[in-house]
UniProtKB/Swiss-Prot annotation:
SMART domains xrefs: TPR
Entry keyword Kinase: no
Gene3D superfamilies reported in the protein's UniProt record: Tetratricopeptide repeat domain
Protein name: Interferon-induced protein with tetratricopeptide repeats 3
Gene Ontology BP terms: defense response to virus; innate immune response; negative regulation of apoptotic process; negative regulation of cell population proliferation; response to virus
InterPro entries: TPR-like_helical_dom_sf (IPR011990), TPR_rpt (IPR019734)
Subcellular location: Cytoplasm; Mitochondrion
PANTHER family (alphabetical): INTERFERON-INDUCED PROTEIN WITH TETRATRICOPEPTIDE REPEATS, INTERFERON-INDUCED PROTEIN WITH TETRATRICOPEPTIDE REPEATS 3
Positions of modified residues (Phosphoserine): S203, S478
Length: 490
């Protein structure tokens, strides 16, 4: 194929709606355990969702440099779409075909790439668009993919867009509910139970969403009501691994640790190589030890041996988790009840990819805020996550200016900028400079007060600049909202 045709192909590639244009991973950095989780879902998910996972697996294989394996995954996806969505096969295949074009392009097989370009073009022409169309099923496909990659905010947008066209679609509604549930770990993005209840109403057989509703109600101190949904889901889907795993989390948080261990072990029967599950069981045994110690049972004559046995179980399962290739950062990141230093500080000292470390610092920051823990610690981990993001694009600049991390990451009109600066100076032992920064933050907050008290803390020029600054910055004013928009800053 001629060079001209290659150039024309390169103009088409960015127009294709597929994994290569969805910005799934920052700098194409994939967490190490994602491929295992995707493969696990291919094995145990219902057939109609497997094509979505095969497409994602194809992209992961490409990022690993294994394009031949990527092509095999795309063939599997194409076959499944033909089987499960025969009436919509062409539209449902657009994402797969787009992925084909990109993989063949990277392999230098331009004639094969052109074959799939023509397939996309023929389908999209029916909708008066050459290479991409707006279609709710495609938004849903992207939504599930973004959700699997941990990009919950983007997934939420995709499902909301799909629901605009088909507001009563059960799959779209379930996707939105799941995305919003995962966003609920961020204290600024908590949501009501309505979206979960609506998803259950539209899809009453979706037992996984029922368990998520139970977990949400538990978080709202409505544990008894939540347990009814969990019990119903377990009764109707006693072997569904995502239901069992989430139900186990419910009982772990309830303190019914024996029930939690039983459910986690049932999941292990289907996924014996899942290190995360071994870790969860180990955490449950640790919690059982603490339960006995807190109630004074450890002093009883026969209980000392039991406690030692529980400690050994905890150690055995933890070691088993590591043997199975557990990524410590992902294991610890969703255990809000294990925020103690012994469980949470260890992974940050591990040698792991920046993409995983950055994600975990941000999750830890959110958990500290959500649970009302140390504000200084929340800011510290928020800065660590932002710093990792900055280093990945400009490593030398950060290396040369280690003391000015926050200034490089946040503009002065960012919400609570001076409060953040104050905390940094405080942590560095410069209390005088910290006090000056806190004064500036107070001045910002009080700038528009009728009494003019803001002038005590700000210079005349800073007061004059204030109106423009406030217009550009977010409306956040609480110190606890300091890092609420960190995803946008990364």
């Amino acid at each position: 194929m001629s060079e001209v045709t290659k150039n024309s192909l390169e103009k088409i590639l960015p127009q294709l709606k597929c994994h290569f244009t969805w910005n799934l991973f920052k700098e194409e950095s994939v967490s190490r355990d994602l491929e295992d989780r995707v493969c696990n879902q291919i094995e145990f998910l219902n057939t109609e969702f497997k094509a979505t996972m095969y497409n994602l697996l194809a992209y992961i294989k490409h990022l690993d440099g294994n394009n031949e394996a990527a092509l095999e995954c795309l063939r599997q996806a194409e076959e499944l779409i033909q089987q499960e969505h025969a009436d919509q096969a062409e539209i449902r295949s657009l994402v797969t075909w787009g992925n084909y074009v990109w993989v063949y392009y990277h392999l230098g097989r331009l004639s094969d790439a052109q074959i799939y370009v023509d397939k996309v073009k023929q389908t999209c022409k029916k909708f008066s668009n050459p290479y991409s169309i707006e279609y709710s099923e495609l938004d849903c496909e992207e939504g599930w993919t973004q959700l699997k990659c941990g990009r919950n905010e983007r997934a939420k947008v995709c499902f909301e867009k799909a629901l605009e066209e088909k507001p009563n679609n059960p799959e779209f509604s379930s996707g939105l509910a799941i995305a919003m549930y995962h966003l609920d770990n961020n204290p600024e993005k908590q949501f009501s139970t309505d979206v979960l209840k609506q998803a259950i109403e539209l899809s009453p057989d979706n037992q996984y969403v029922k368990v998520l509703l139970g977990l949400k109600l538990q978080k709202m101190n409505k544990e008894a009501e939540g347990e009814q949904f969990v019990e119903e889901a377990l009764e109707k889907a006693p072997c569904q691994t995502d239901v069992l795993r989430s139900a186990a989390k419910f009982y772990r948080r309830k303190g019914d640790l024996d029930k939690a261990i039983e459910l986690f072990q049932r999941v292990l029967e289907s996924t014996p190589n899942n290190g995360y599950l071994y870790h969860q069981i180990g955490c449950c045994y640790k919690a059982k030890v603490r339960q006995m110690q807190n109630t004074g049972e450890s002093e009883a004559s026969g209980n000392k041996e039991m406690i030692e046995a529980l400690k050994q179980y905890a150690m055995d399962y933890s070691n088993k988790a590591l043997e199975k290739g557990l990524n410590p950062l992902n294991a610890y990141s969703d255990c809000a009840e294990f925020l103690e230093t012994e469980c949470y500080q260890t992974p940050f000292n591990k040698e792991v990819p920046d993409a995983e470390k950055q994600q975990s610092h941000q999750r830890y920051c959110n958990l500290q805020k959500y649970n009302g823990k140390s504000e200084d610690t929340a800011v510290q981990h928020g800065l660590e996550g932002l710093s990792i993001s900055k280093k990945s694009t400009d490593k030398e600049e950060i290396k040369d200016q280690p003391q000015n991390v926050s200034e490089n990451l946040l503009p002065q009109n960012a919400p609570n900028y001076w409060y953040l600066q104050g905390l940094i100076h405080k942590q560095n032992g410069d209390l005088l400079q910290a006090a000056k920064c806190y004064e500036k933050e107070l001045g910002r907050l009080l700038r528009d007060a009728p009494s003019g008290i803001g002038s005590i803390f700000l210079s005349a020029s800073e007061l004059e600049d204030g109106s423009e600054e406030m217009g550009q910055g977010a409306v956040s004013s609480s110190p606890r909202e300091l890092l609420s928009n960190s995803e946008q800053l990364n």
